Amino acid sequence: PVCVYYKVAAEYRNGHAQKLGNMVVKEFLAQEAANSKVKPGILPEAIFEFLWYDPSVEEREFDDLPLARYFEDLGLLALRSSWQRDARVFSIKCGAPGGAKQWREGWKILQDEGIDLFSLSHHHPDNLSYIFASGGEYFTCEDGYNRNLMPDNHNVLLVDGRYTDAQDVNDVYMTSVEQRQKEEGKDFSPESYGGFVSCVKVEGNLAVYRGETAGVYPRHMQMQEVSRVLVTDGLGFWLFADIFNSQKSHIYSVICNTDPLPCPQEKGYRYPMETGDIRYQVFSSAPTETRQYEQQVVSVMTTQEQDKLCRTCIHTLSTDSQTPQTSQVFFECFTFAGSEAKVCCQQGMLHLEWNGNVYKLTVGEYDAGVGRSPVRLRVTRDGAETAEYSL
């Protein structure tokens, strides 16, 4: 809501928040009100936009803000190519349900005082999922505000088509926890459920991120590792290394949900975008097959009027293991038309050339001692300087 921007602006004399609030009021509020299905509507309820507005707070341009920001509590990394209107924007998240502090303190209060504070139906089960937009045009998408969530509604990593213990329910995380508690009894540990970020590095335009989320998958799957490593340089491209390790054999899947429809190419897929087409290629340590399908997501906007629905179409491209595997690595590569990026994968090493730089990404064997596979990144700039990163 706009009122939140104005409250932050007034409370902290924050000119950035004031600029955002004014921008939404002038450019987007009328359109949102016209499209809203909630009665009586957002304009009759906009009292706080008036009460919290402080005209003495001066707007401040965004140019002095960083292009990368990591929010530790949520395990959320947000990236921008610039603060211009045509900027590319990317975010990825991996953490405890509701955030680390809420998860930790909620269980403490439940144990000490017997009060159940958990209500996570608005918190999406989307560890390692990501969102990308360019110049205000969305590439990836998700289910939005949907009452009952399915595993492939987000750009997550699936094991035998599953992500959590429960699915097709309103509160996926807490329903899954209830099932887990029934199975494990007193052995259930809240600390072992959810995900965490094991590495974040931002050096200039280079951003590297690694999240681990094996804890959310059903116990009987015996997942030892489900990791995603992100590498990007100023959002001129982005790469994922998706890593699966288990004591059992499974079919693993990487999901790519998008607004534009993917078009098959000789190598990979092309996504037509007004702001510049995107090329998508997947390499894997084991044979794969792909599936394309549409998801029709129907959301009830308010329980007061359940016939007022929001319908969303998601184009899904799923890359799956061809046969069950105990371990498998997928490299996902996103490059842009006109960038002349070159991508190949040889002997387990992903090799990308872009803007005169060379990026080499390798994944080693699973290390039971640390609970994950070693990942190494080598970046050579302008054919000379080389930097190495252990992730």
Where are these regions (language model features)?
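Extended polysaccharide-engagement surfaces of secreted carbohydrate-active enzymes
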Residues: P1-L391
